[in-house]
Structure formats: C-alpha cells, structure tokens
C-alpha cells in the first residue's frame, strides 16, 4: 500500500497545487466499466468533521459503471454513502507522473468550496486500494450525464437523443450563460482561475443547471503572484486567451475570454476553428484571429446584443474584457429585456 501524504498537506492553507506546463483536457472517451482498482481498501482514520473530506471511507464506495477515461485516468459513476457521485481515479503513469500529480492537486483547488454552479469535491485521498495503479482518488458530486458540448453539437450518451433546437433557444442560451458566469464570479471571488473553461467541461444536471467541472488546469491567484514562473498554462488551445498563448501570467480575464468562445459556440453551434493547432495559435496572437461571425449575430437586434457580449469577452487585451461581475450584470439585463 502506498504511504499517504502527511496530513498537513491536506489542510486548506497547504492546498496550493499550482502547476506550470502540463497537458490538460484529454476528452473523456466512453468505455466499458471495469473492475475497481483493488480488493483491499485502506482503513479510513477518524477525523474531525472539518477534515472529513481528506479521506475516503472505502467501505461506502459502490461503483456503478465507467463514465469515461482520459490522459490522467478514469471517471466512474458510483454511490458514496448511498448518494450518487462521480469518482476520478488519477493514474500513476511513470511517463507523465509529474503532470498527473499536478492534475490531482489542481482538482483540489476547489475542495471545501460550495456553489450551485461548481462541481463539489466530496472526498479525496492519496490512499488507494492495495494493488491499484492510482496516485489518488477524488469523489465529486454527480453533476449529470450530459455536457454542454453534447447539447450544442447533439451528441449524448443519454438513451433519448437531445434536440439542439429545443435545448438551445435564446432563452436557454442566456440561462446557461448566467449559470456559467455565476460560477466564474464565485471562483474569482475565491482567487481561483479555472483556465480550461469550454463546453466539454460544463456539466448539465437533471435540474437543468450548468456546473463547471474539471479543475485539473486550475490555479490560485496568490500562487501565480508569489511564483511568476508558473505562467505557462495548460488548457485547450481553441479557448485559450492570447496572453496565455504568449506565455504571460494568467488573470481572471483569461476565463472571461474562454467564456466568450463558449458563448459563440452556444449561439452558432459551430466549432471555433479549423486547421492545425499551431497555425491557429499563431494567428490568434499575431493577427487577432477569432471565430467567424455568423448570420445569427447580425439578423436581429438580439443577435447584435449577443455579438457585443461575445466581442467584449474575447478582446485581445485582457484589461479591455469585462470582469465576471459586470458580465453577470449585462447578461441579467439582456435576459430581463427579453421578458
């Protein structure tokens, strides 16, 4: 059995798993459920209620099926103490061990935080069942089977296919946008940057609420300020702000840029770019390349209002983009004007 990290590593003050360069956002690929990692779970120690999330009561874990797998491990649907949850197992891969460790600790940047539009961490531990090839396990609330990406592009694992036209009316688009911005506003108020915001990382619950998930690229602002060398950020190139592509230090405005691309996707139901990633990245920085404006943005007054919102979010200079609070105010006013 691997030795656990010392307890002080779990304390809130020590939960500072910032990262520099790493590969992130490997899309989850659906696969058949397999046997859970081992048969002999470690015994959970007695902890105060404040620290209860730091360890997993393995006897209360019941795996249902695998939801998918990616570069850093697998995600399962399960129950924990009888409640539906998602369990992320981070692989112990020698080739990418350091990146996997960073991903694991970055996911815990949101530990002990609670917000309706943020996936909640229920429990986490570096102690894993004997014989497993995992460096850590994270139990999260189950946010739903469907992502915003699946709603936009019509692909879903749900038994009943979604109708994009029904699911993404203007009203629905604004509702989802406000959910996402509310989540960002909360994260930024806690000095946390997501840094990989995109439709595939937005879960939609059974109550039709958007929840921001996948914090494997997240960073804390104070760590970026204390250690400026941590400025080379992982993420998804189509949604990365120009300043990040240039290797500059991340700010909350980087998440706003990513939201602008996401809002464009919700409105057009198109993919942002075509072409080789390196050419797209160069053009975004050197030539201010952005996704093409579609007719939906110019055909009506509401379309033009949406265009203005998107345009403000993906401005080349971070200082020219609105903060989450102002963006929330504008979207609420827009939604209210529609009645």
From Swiss-Prot:
Function: Serine/threonine kinase involved in the regulation of MAPK signaling. Is an activator of the ERK1/2 signaling cascade playing an essential role in the stimulation of oocyte maturation.
Tissue and organ distribution: Expressed mainly in gonadal tissues, and cardiac and skeletal muscles.
Principal subcellular localisation of the protein: cytoplasm
Biological source species: Rattus norvegicus (Rat)
Domain of life of the native organism: Eukaryota
Localization of this protein: Cytoplasm
Family per record: Belongs to the protein kinase superfamily. Ser/Thr protein kinase family.
UniProt-recorded name of the protein: Proto-oncogene serine/threonine-protein kinase mos
InterPro entries: Kinase-like_dom_sf, Prot_kinase_dom, Protein_kinase_ATP_BS, Ser/Thr_kinase_AS, Ser/Thr_Kinases-Pseudokinases
Positions of ATP binding: 67-75, 88
Gene Ontology terms, MF aspect: ATP binding; MAP kinase kinase kinase activity; MRF binding; protein kinase activity; protein serine kinase activity; protein serine/threonine kinase activity
Quaternary structure and interacting proteins, as annotated: Interacts with MAP2K1/MEK1.
GO cellular component terms listed in the entry, alphabetical order: cytoplasm; cytosol
One Pfam family linked to the record: Pkinase
Domain Protein kinase: 61-335
Keyword annotations of the record: ATP-binding, Cytoplasm, Kinase, Nucleotide-binding, Proto-oncogene, Serine/threonine-protein kinase, Transferase
Catalytic activity line of the entry: L-seryl-[protein] + ATP = O-phospho-L-seryl-[protein] + ADP + H(+); L-threonyl-[protein] + ATP = O-phospho-L-threonyl-[protein] + ADP + H(+)
Catalytic residues as annotated in Swiss-Prot or TrEMBL: 196
EC number: 2.7.11.1
GO terms for biological process, alphabetical: cellular response to cAMP; cellular response to nerve growth factor stimulus; chromatin organization; ERK1 and ERK2 cascade; establishment of meiotic spindle orientation; intracellular signal transduction; MAPK cascade; meiotic cell cycle process involved in oocyte maturation
């Amino acid at each position: 059995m691997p030795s656990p990290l010392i307890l002080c590593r779990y304390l809130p003050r020590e939960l500072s798993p910032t990262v520099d360069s790493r590969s992130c956002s490997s899309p989850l690929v659906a696969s058949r459920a397999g046997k859970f990692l081992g048969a002999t779970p470690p015994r959970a120690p007695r902890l105060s209620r404040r620290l209860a999330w730091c360890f997993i009561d393995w006897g209360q874990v019941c795996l249902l099926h695998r939801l998918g797998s990616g570069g850093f491990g697998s995600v399962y649907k399960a129950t924990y103490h009888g409640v539906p949850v998602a369990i992320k197992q981070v692989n112990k891969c020698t080739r990418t061990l350091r990146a996997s460790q960073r991903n694991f600790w970055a996911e815990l940047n949101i530990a002990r935080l609670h917000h309706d539009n943020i996936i909640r961490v229920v429990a986490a531990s570096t102690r894993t069942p004997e014989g497993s090839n995992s460096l850590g396990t994270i139990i999260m609330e189950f946010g739903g089977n469907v992502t915003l990406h699946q709603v936009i592009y019509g692909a879903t694992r749900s038994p009943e296919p979604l109708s994009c036209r029904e699911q993404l009316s203007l009203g629905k688009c604004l509702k989802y946008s406000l959910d996402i911005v509310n989540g960002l506003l909360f994260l930024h108020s806690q000095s946390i940057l997501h840094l990989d915001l995109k439709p595939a990382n937005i879960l939609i619950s059974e109550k039709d609420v958007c929840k921001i998930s996948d914090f494997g690229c997240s960073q804390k602002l104070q760590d970026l300020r204390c250690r400026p060398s941590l400025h080379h950020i992982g993420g998804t190139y189509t949604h990365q702000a120009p300043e990040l592509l240039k290797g500059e230090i991340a700010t909350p405005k980087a998440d706003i840029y990513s939201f602008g691309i996401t809002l464009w996707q919700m409105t057009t139901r198109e993919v942002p770019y075509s072409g080789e990633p390196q050419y797209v990245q160069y053009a975004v920085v050197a030539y201010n390349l952005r996704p093409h404006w579609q007719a939906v943005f110019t055909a009506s007054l509401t379309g033009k209002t949406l265009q203005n919102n998107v345009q403000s979010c993906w401005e080349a200079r971070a200082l020219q983009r609105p903060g989450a609070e102002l963006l929330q105010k504008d979207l609420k006013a827009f939604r209210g004007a529609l009645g």
